[in-house]
């Protein structure tokens, strides 16, 4: 939408900050906005959050917008992230994917579906299992890789359907791509693709 409005050509002398949140920003758009901000003396800040944590859990400092392109950044002051293999096993190694878990004073106490639920008190204890899969690099910056529910276990290996979609979009530009499936089979839908290229796609993924 901003491109159609010719945002990058607008005379916005009062604009000092640009922020983004609400969904993972594609790396190419992240880089484009970061480079625009740097070239015009503005600050571009990417953020990550969920309603259950009062909207914000992380931010990517403007100075790292290009260097850490694609990252959701680091935890906000007072907060902390962990990468968990399961509910009790923390992943310590960098660049290893697991569920992103946040701890902080801004985590909701829980959900009340009736008046009696209000008496339960704090059910979360300041800890939120986000349902997002992520990894942490060697410098402590976090990257969302997909949703926990969008993983399949095929031939003993965990397959991220979000990563497969991104991989194919990078190779086949202009093609609409969606993945779905069960643990024993993944289905890939590609609109705008020559049916004769199916074998090529299969070889590319294997």
Predicted regions, residues:
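Gly/Ser/Thr-rich phosphate-binding loop
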Residues: 2-68, 80, 87
């Amino acid at each position: 939408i901003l491109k159609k409005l010719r945002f990058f050509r607008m005379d916005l002398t009062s604009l000092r900050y640009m922020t983004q949140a609400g969904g993972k920003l594609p790396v190419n758009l992240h880089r484009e906005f970061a480079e625009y901000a740097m070239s015009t003396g503005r600050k571009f800040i990417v953020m990550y959050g969920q309603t259950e944590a009062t909207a914000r859990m992380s931010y990517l400092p403007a100075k790292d917008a290009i260097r850490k392109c694609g990252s959701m950044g680091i935890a906000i002051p007072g907060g902390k992230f962990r990468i968990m293999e399961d509910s009790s096993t923390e992943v310590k190694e960098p660049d290893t994917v697991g569920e992103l878990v946040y701890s902080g004073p801004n985590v909701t106490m829980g959900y009340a579906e009736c008046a009696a639920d209000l008496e339960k008190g704090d059910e979360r204890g300041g800890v939120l299992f986000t349902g997002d899969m992520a990894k942490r690099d060697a410098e402590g910056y976090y990257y969302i890789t997909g949703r926990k529910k969008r993983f399949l276990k095929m031939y003993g290996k965990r397959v991220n359907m979000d990563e497969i979609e991104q991989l194919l979009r990078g190779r086949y530009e202009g093609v609409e791509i969606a993945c779905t499936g069960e643990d024993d089979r993944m289905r890939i839908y590609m609109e705008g693709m020559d049916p004769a290229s199916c074998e090529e796609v299969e070889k590319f993924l294997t």
